[in-house]
Amino acid sequence: MEKVTIAAFGGSLRSKSYNGYLLKTASKNVPEGVDFKIAPIRNLPMYNTDEEENPSEAVVNFKNVLRDADGILVVTPEYNYSIPGFIKNAIDIASRPYSDNVLKGKHVAVMSASIGAFGGMRAQYHLRQVFVYLDMKQINKPEVFINFAQDKFDPNGELRDEKSLLLIQELMKKLAAECRLSRKSLPV
């Protein structure tokens, strides 16, 4: 089986966030033959076009992890019915300048967790709009919205909900499979 690389970013800036736990859960549930890497976002500066020609080390490292990946996983909280600023900032950095958009054409999957009833779905829908513009290949199903996350993760961040775990595993399998198919269709 050909090895593929999936790079992930997101979670939350908060140390004990449910989305951080979700990112950790996804990392433990990748199918065989997947190299899973975290693209570091904590030290990214705010996106500024003035800095495109001389990016910081944090920007270079972040973009290189994404550039080298076959697929991308974004794990997002929902703030005020939308995408948190740090997630949008990371996407802006990864996609600019347009001549160095490391997201274009990549397969992408998204997951979210929330203490509310909707599990972050509104943030996911906004992300999906952004992904269309960036010409990313979205894995649309299964949708992984973990609602009432406080009841589904234990105090150590371990996911206790079997249905959610199965959805995560299925989404990771689909993302990996689509990445493999794309590799096979590339001209030699």
Question: What do these predicted ranges mean?
Answer:
Residues E2-G33:
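N-terminal beta1-alpha1 ligand-phosphate binding loop
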Residues A7, K137-V188:
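Glycine-rich phosphate/pyrophosphate-binding loop and the adjoining helix
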Residues S15-Y18, Y47, S82-I83, G119-G120:
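Secondary-structure boundary/capping motif
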Residues P31-K37, M136-K137:
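A generic structural motif
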Residues K37-P45, V144-Q150:
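Short connector loops at secondary-structure junctions
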Residues I41-E57, F153:
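N-terminal beta-loop-helix "entrance" segment that forms/cooperates
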Residues S56-D135:
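Helix-loop-strand module that forms the ligand-binding subsite of alpha/beta enzymes
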